[in-house]
From Swiss-Prot:
InterPro entries assigned to the protein according to its UniProt record, in alphabetical order: UPF0250_YbeD-like, YbeD-like_sf
Name this polypeptide is given: UPF0250 protein Lcho_4239
Domain of life: Bacteria
Disulfide bridge positions per record: none
Organism this protein belongs to: Leptothrix cholodnii (strain ATCC 51168 / LMG 8142 / SP-6) (Leptothrix discophora (strain SP-6))
Pfam families: DUF493
């Protein structure tokens, strides 16, 4: 992947970067997402995860805020989250 010159990037690194992850409200979903976040940001605070169940309770929306250190890190994190079988969507 071609690097975007620093002056053209919309994100300044390092920075706190929120990511929304949605999936079925099933046991282990939160823990799986926290485990992934910790692999990409060892300083990630699991107790900082914001949780929002859907109205019917079938889905769970999570907001994780990681310390973004590079575009490559964010791209890899998005790929891993998106590829997880419990995840429906990543924003």
């Amino acid at each position: 992947m071609q690097d975007i010159p620093r002056e053209q990037s919309l994100i300044e690194y390092p920075s706190a970067f929120p990511i929304k992850v949605m999936g079925a409200h099933v046991p282990g979903f939160l823990e799986a997402i926290v485990e992934i976040a910790l692999r990409f940001d060892p300083a990630f605070a699991p107790d900082s995860v914001e949780q929002r169940p859907s109205k019917a309770g079938n889905y769970l929306g999570l907001t994780i805020t990681v310390t973004a250190t590079s575009r490559d890190q964010l791209d890899a994190l998005y790929r891993e989250l998106s590829g997880h079988p419990m995840v429906k969507i990543v924003l």
